[in-house]
Structure formats: structure tokens, C-alpha cells
Amino acid sequence: MASIASSVAVRLGLTQVLPNKNFSSPRSTRLVVRAAEEAAAAPAAASPEGEAPKAAAKPPPIGPKRGSKVRIMRKESYWYKGVGSVVAVDQDPKTRYPVVVRFNKVNYANVSTNNYALDEIQEVA
């Protein structure tokens, strides 16, 4: 019976409380069901027909464009003062090393890519 209630609770997106270990009987369990806040807020947030929600303006892209050539300015890097091409740039401002750069030659560990911070690279024309 408890497994049926828990499976229904999972399907409906509800939370349950696991059995309390302070009960004297090891088989006694208690099921507490609380409705999720997101499920209750979803119908209220529905917009009237005919109105499309306005999209938030995108911030300008961070870092160099994909495929552009960059010079490495990190002194301890194997590719210091070398030129590589940008593979990807993480647009999250909290990322420490958002720019992935690929090089033609490999380092001692046979790796040809590395991540760099925005102040450790310089775009080459």
C-alpha cells in the first residue's frame, strides 16, 4: 500500500517524508504529501490567448568569436605566445576559464586544447 502511494506521489511531482526511525515498530511508516509550488504556480502564470511573452534582450556575446585566431598570454602555458583557434566560448560570466583554444601542435601530455581566461588571450588579426 505504501509503495502505491509513493509511486502516485512521484508521478504527481509531490514530495514524501521517509519513515521516522524513532517509532517503536520498524514497519510503521508515515507518508506526508505536499504539493509542489511550481505545479500550483504554472496555471496562474498562463498568459491570455493572443499574447506572446516578450523575450528578454540577449546580452552581447562574451569573448572572441568561434574560429578566430588568438595569441596566448599566460606565461606558464605550453603554448605561451603561440597562436591557436577558438573552439568555444562559455557565455556564463561566472566561468573562470571560458575560452577553449585548439592548437596545431600537442604538448607533453599529447593534448592540443586548453581553456583560458579572457585576459589571457589576445585576438590576432
From Swiss-Prot:
Cellular component annotations (GO), alphabetically ordered: chloroplast thylakoid membrane; photosystem I reaction center
Pfam family, one: PSI_PsaE
Residues of the transit peptide: 1-34
Record's compositionally biased regions (Low complexity): 42-57
Keywords: Chloroplast, Membrane, Photosynthesis, Photosystem I, Plastid, Thylakoid, Transit peptide
Molecular function as annotated in GO: phosphoprotein binding
Membrane topology: Peripheral membrane protein
GO biological process: photosynthesis
Principal subcellular localisation of the protein: plastid
Chain intervals for the UniProt region annotation (Disordered): 42-68
Annotated localization: Plastid, Chloroplast thylakoid membrane
Signal sequence range: none
Family to which this protein belongs: Belongs to the PsaE family.
Functional note: Stabilizes the interaction between PsaC and the PSI core, assists the docking of the ferredoxin to PSI and interacts with ferredoxin-NADP oxidoreductase.
Protein name per the record: Photosystem I reaction center subunit IV, chloroplastic
Species this chain originates from: Spinacia oleracea (Spinach)
Lineage: Eukaryota, Viridiplantae, Streptophyta, Embryophyta, Tracheophyta
Gene coding for it: PSAE-1
